[in-house]
Design a protein with these regions (language model features):
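Short, solvent-exposed loop/turn segments enriched in Ser/Thr/Gly
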Residues: 28-34, 98
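Intrinsically disordered, low-complexity Pro/Gly/Ser/Thr-rich segments with frequent PxxP/GP/PP motifs
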Residues: 62-94
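Asparagine-centered strand-capping/turn motif at beta-strand->loop junctions
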Residues: 37-41
């Protein structure tokens, strides 16, 4: 097994526009994102912190760093998953998010799990 496969997490994302928490007249667009993190490696590892890069359609970038996710620093065994839901606000009807999770394996090895860019967008309404 390669080192790359020994230390690996996968991340999947589902997004949702929150119309009831948004106000287009105030340029306030609320979105939820549901994350599933899976330890696809061969050793147990703990998610320590996160780094998000949130970009709206105007190109405004907001970086968010913090410990854990939703108050937790989950320790995941191989093939174990952790799910959570969080949210963000944009000043435009659409934008994107991407980032990384900083992770430490039980043997002390530090690595990052990449969070591929995903889109946040107000659904189009057809009349």
């Amino acid at each position: 097994m390669t080192t790359q496969n020994k230390y690996a997490f996968s991340v999947s994302v589902i997004t949702q526009y929150l119309a009831d928490q948004s106000d287009a007249d105030e340029d306030r667009y609320a979105f939820a994102y549901h994350i599933t993190i899976t330890n696809t490696g061969a050793v147990a590892a703990q998610l320590i912190s996160r780094h998000w890069i949130i970009t709206d359609d105007n190109g405004t970038v907001n970086e968010v760093r913090g410990l854990g996710v939703v108050g937790a620093q989950p320790l995941l065994q191989p093939n174990e998953q952790f799910e959570y839901t969080s949210g963000t606000l944009l000043n435009t009807p659409s934008g994107s998010m991407r980032g990384t999770y900083q992770i430490v394996a039980v043997d002390g090895t530090q690595f990052e799990a990449m969070i591929a860019p995903f889109t946040l967008a107000v659904p189009r309404v057809l009349h």
